[in-house]
Amino acid sequence: RFEPWMALSFSEGSIGGDIERVRPEALAAFYENQPLSQWDQGTGARSAIRAVASQGEALGLPSASVGSNGFAISPLKSESGNALLLINPHTSFYFRHEAHVKSDEGLNAYGASTWGQFFVYQGFNETAGWMHTSSAVDNIDEFEETIVRQEDGLFYRYGDELRPVEQKTVTVRLRQDDGTFTVERYPTYRTHHGPIVRAEGDRWVAVALMEEPRKALIQSYARTKAKNLDEFLEIMESHTNSSNNTVFADAAGNIAYLHSNFVPKRRSDLDYLNPVDGSDPSTDWQGLHTIEESPNSINPPTGWVQNTNNWPYSAAGTEHSPRQKDYPPYMDSGSENARGIHALALLEPMSAVDLDGLVTLAYDEALPAFDELLPPLFTAFADLPGDAPAKARLAPAIAQLEAWDRRYAIDSVATAVAIFWGDALRDAVRDEARANRWNMLTVMAEAAPAVQLKALEDALARLETGFGTWETPWGEINRFQRLSGAIDLRYDDSAPSLPVAFTSSFWGSLAAFGAAPRNGTQRWYGNRGNSFVAVVEFGEKVRARAITAGGLSRIPGDRHFDDQAERYAVGDLREVYFYPDAIAAHSLGTYRPGEPRP
């Protein structure tokens, strides 16, 4: 059942709110007085809340579920002279619900809402559109507090002061298996830096983050009514869009990349990715950076902006983006990623594009990560002695990869071999990359020749075991399937499914499809990545095309349970009916919530 406070617990709409950066295991260990041995070794003792989308991608984590793409095209590069917008969040399937929300007081927004929220998070109205991408901004910090226990209570050291630790008891009702409720009470602690979330040796650790849920909720809703860029920027003065960047376009022809607009000012000589000394007042936040102080790109001469969870320093290409040297290091802790490289390769040479062309860009088949990864493999194979047993075994697969255009396709054997090999190579070097926090693609490309070749042997063996032959087309492996409306879906190789060509964003696929064998299957089934996708043109009237993974109903057998699946699998976006006459012409009927559906 919905309760009003729930909206305040998740007020900005992203994949995970800022509070999700706090690790529950460490939180539980602190409040249950359990040892934190797992956090006291190696990188485990580093900041528990710095994992952001682009860093996870660099480390080779399952990135297809935590990425997003946004492109905005100005009249300079639009065939129609109208601004265009690509809205392409990568989330868990069915986590974004497509809706058109109207009121008699000026609300008229279309797009995707996150479960449990009442505002359109990524979408458009009649004259403006917004796409949010997870940011690598460093705006969540940890402060190590020196705790002093005295007879009259708990204190923490701050400069020459001893300040009291704020203590509060939180009461939580817990539902039992039989439907009854029990009441549990938990003590909580906080300092002026924020709540205590874990311990680091004998110090307590407070987390500092954006704690303005009411303002964040107002900003999230108000921006859906913004008519143009000026109104959108005015709403951003709330500074509560903390974990996301924005790609924007409007009917006046404006486009913009807008960096996360919650960026605390702090010392640039300290590494805030690690906990800092909370007893030193000079480590404190010193207010927030203004919008003008952020690495935005507004109406650049390129005629386009893009963000793929990469850094802001390529938002408008190599010549016209913000310059990294002009900003403190905490302004963005990410880097370029494979999707960003892919986007730049498409946008920089582009002369002009229309709405259909924007769809083509969004589903471009190139996998640029393999441009970096495959040459070292080819060298390793070429250096094998002619009489080496592996030479004959691997030669046919190497020939497939050498002839491959490095573009995905459902009938491509090379796509399957490359991805299986890439997965095996990533597994082989994962621990080294994580331990040193090195870029995963770089570590893979620099792996020893023997490691490269062993990964290919492992990939071919896995293909033969799972599918009978290593020469299996990618579409026989990579599938879309929806059998129920459950949140935790089950998959079945014997049940109907659809081939999907696009793949993990780790390889640079702009259209992302996070697939893997699941619950004992041989085939790979996607459950994250492209969820809601839309392209929008802002002319005298707004035009849009969109697609949602599977369908909008969660009820198997309902006409809308999987009616979009075939279109989704091939990137065939349908027309959006935005205006009343179009809605009336295509409606099956009307009803109010609680009434039987037509």
Regions found by a protein language model. Name each.
Residues 63-67, 76-83, 87-97, 197-215, ...:
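Active-site-adjacent "gating/activation" loops or surface patches in catalytic cores
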Residues 81-82, 126-128, 242-244, 302, ...:
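Loop/turn elements at helix/coil->beta-strand transitions in domains of secreted/extracellular proteins
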Residues 72, 85-86, 129, 247-248, ...:
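Structured core elements
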Residues 57-61, 69-75, 82, 107-110, ...:
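Generic recognition of flexible, low-complexity loop/linker segments
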Residues 1-96, 104-106, 111-119, 424, ...:
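Substrate-recognition/specificity elements adjacent to catalytic centers across diverse enzyme folds
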